[in-house]
Amino acid sequence: MSSRLAGQVAIVTGGARQIGFAIASRFAAEGASVVLAQRSRDEGEAAEAAIRTAGGEATALTCDVADEDSVAGMVGRTLDLYGRLDVLVNNAGTGVAEHITDLSWDDYRRVIDINVGGVLLGTKYAARQMKVSGRGGSIINISSIQGVLPLRQSAVYAGSKGAVNLITQQTAADLGCFGIRVNAIAPGYIDNEMMHSYHTLVSETPGAAISAARGSIVLGRLGTTDDIAGPALFLASSDSAYVTGTLMLVDGGSQTHGAIA
């Protein structure tokens, strides 16, 4: 690796699983000290051990991104451990696949509190430290193709990711004067647990639905979590020093086909 993040400290919320773990692992391989902010202590510690075994530096901290005290404490603990904060990846998220006529308000609150509230809280406390440091920083929000592309039974999840897209633009405008860049990545069909769960819920034949989704993608394949880690590294590094307020679609070209599920 090229050590593009040598000496930097990065927080990845939801960093112990799936896309979050791929990003955290890539950052650590590039020289960053990575904090894995995860609700599950066991998952966080397992991810920390995996990164350390691979030669990286990582620390798992328990955090509920929907709880302000928990987020504030996690950022404070990061500073206690490493003395600085350069990158925040607001990756933690959740979803629900419900038809709007059957929507549970409890599900609505859970999705919005985590997907929208978690981004706002993480940005609030990370940006405070980045501002004080005078070094600026990079905040990366993990959105979704569903924030720009209609999919079935996704009103709440899609709405939450649409909000993330606008929050990204607004906070980029608010924080640019402090040298803090804010960008978002919108993954498309990523071959992971969340994507398979979605199709199991909304389709009677999930295997056929996934095959149809694959066929609608210009590049002809589902994405991998590593396909998201690479763009995240770009946005975290100085290679993207003049990039802010941007939504990067990482979807293999699926957005060119309109609604695809």
How does the language model describe each region?
Residues H99-I100, D107-I112, A213:
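Substrate-binding pocket helix/loop in short-chain dehydrogenase/reductase
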Residues S144:
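Residue(s) in the substrate-gating loop at a strand-loop-helix junction
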Residues L149, A232-L233, T244-A261:
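Short C-terminal tail/terminal secondary-structure segment
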Residues T123, S160, T168:
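Active-site helix of classical SDR
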Residues V9, A16-Q18:
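Conserved glycine-rich cofactor-binding loop
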Residues R128, A173-C177, A241:
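Alpha-helical segment proximal to the catalytic Tyr-Lys
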Residues V89, G176, R181, V243-G245:
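Short, small/polar-rich loop/turn modules that mediate ligand/substrate recognition or access, typified
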